[in-house]
Structures are given as C-alpha cells and as structure tokens.
Amino acid sequence: MQAEDLKLILASTSPRRRELLGRFGLPFEVLGVEVEEVPRCGEAAEDYVRRVASDKSARGQSMAPSDAAVLAADTEVVLDGQIFGKPQGAEHAREMLGRLSGRTHEVLSAVSLRRGDCHWQALSVSRVRFRDLGLEEIDAYWASGEPADKAGAYAIQGRGELFVAELQGSFSGVMGLPLLETARLLRHLGLGTARLLAGAAP
C-alpha cells in the first residue's frame, strides 16, 4: 500500500496523541469521538483500557469514510488495581497524587486500529515510580493547570516529569500513544518500520 493511497484517521482530539502520531510523518486527519468511559463492575484495568480503545475506534469508523483506517487509543493510570481517571478538581488531584507519591504504579495504553472488517489491538504496560511528593508541590502543580485533564493527574511530558524517579517501559505510552505498538499495528496497513522512519525524517 502506498502512503498516499491511505486515508488514516486519528479518533482523538488529544494534542499529545496528535503530536506522537505526527512523528511518523504520515498524513492523517483528526476526528473527535465520544464513548462511555466507565469501568464495569469487576472489570480488570487491562480489559477496560482495551475496551475503551476499541469503542473509540469503532465509533470513529462509524463516522469515517468506508475506506479509511481509524486509529484510537486509551491510557489509564493504575495503582493497586484501581483505575485513576482524570481529576474532578483540586481535592481529587491532591488525593491521587498523594497516593502515587513514593510508590510505583502502572500506565496502561491500549491502541486500536480498524480498516474495513479488520480490527487489530496492542497494549503497552509501563511502570512508573514517583519520588515522595510534598503537599506544597502537589498544590503548586495543580495551580499550573497541567494536570487538570490528565489520567492520574500528571503529564510525564511536562512538569509532571519532575515527580518521576524511575520509568520502566514506554515514555510515549505514558504520554498516551505508545509508538512501538502503534508502528506494529500500522504494518497491517503495509506501512513497515522503514517507511515510518523515512517519513519522520525532516
């Protein structure tokens, strides 16, 4: 498949995912989608993140041209089996960051790709250890506005990296779109790694 013949759609308005997918140098369009993002009773975090990513790509496919390939992702912070979503306010963010302080949590990023009747998925699992955080730091971070719309109330690509003592896994996965797993999925569209590397060159 020639890249110019491929209509690729990112079913997300996240600036982080748009930036990350853009690193491949492929043309793509952005489509905003809305799906229910509420864990089901007893649903494991890995199953949840896979389901939400799948729902997003399915929703995007229903809105896109029939020949388009639709890519979507979902990222969640998980501690002790509990999914940390986006903070509902300052107190919620303070609670989440306080619980993450000095501990290791997981960041799960599921990627879903659809084209026609085909559906492919991949999952990135990263482990992030926070240093001990002070309340003054947490309050100052919330005041910056950065954590307001971020899972787990922090952005590793921004000021939130100052909290990270150790990362095992994918930096881009923690950001919201794991590039290695995404590249593997794009192979199903005939886009090998060499093509993606060439496309990313200036």
Curated annotation (Swiss-Prot):
Q: What is its main location?
A: cytoplasm
Reaction catalysed by this chain? Answer: dTTP + H2O = dTMP + diphosphate + H(+); UTP + H2O = UMP + diphosphate + H(+)
Pfam families (UniProt xref): Maf
Its localization reads:
Cytoplasm
One Gene Ontology BP term is: nucleotide metabolic process
Q: Provide the Gene Ontology terms for cellular component.
A: cytoplasm
Q: Where is the active site?
A: 74 (proton acceptor)
Cofactor dependency: a divalent metal cation
Spell out the residues of the site Important for substrate specificity. 16, 75, 157
Q: What class of enzyme is it?
A: hydrolase
EC number annotated for this UniProt entry: 3.6.1.9
Disulfide bridge partners, by residue number: none
List keywords of the entry alphabetically: Cytoplasm, Hydrolase, Nucleotide metabolism
Q: From the UniProt record, which GO molecular function terms apply? A: dTTP diphosphatase activity; UTP diphosphatase activity
- Which family is this protein grouped under? Belongs to the Maf family. YhdE subfamily.
Described by its record, this protein's role is as follows:
Nucleoside triphosphate pyrophosphatase that hydrolyzes dTTP and UTP. May have a dual role in cell division arrest and in preventing the incorporation of modified nucleotides into cellular nucleic acids.
Q: What is the protein name for this chain?
A: dTTP/UTP pyrophosphatase
Q: Which organism is it from?
A: Methylococcus capsulatus (strain ATCC 33009 / NCIMB 11132 / Bath)
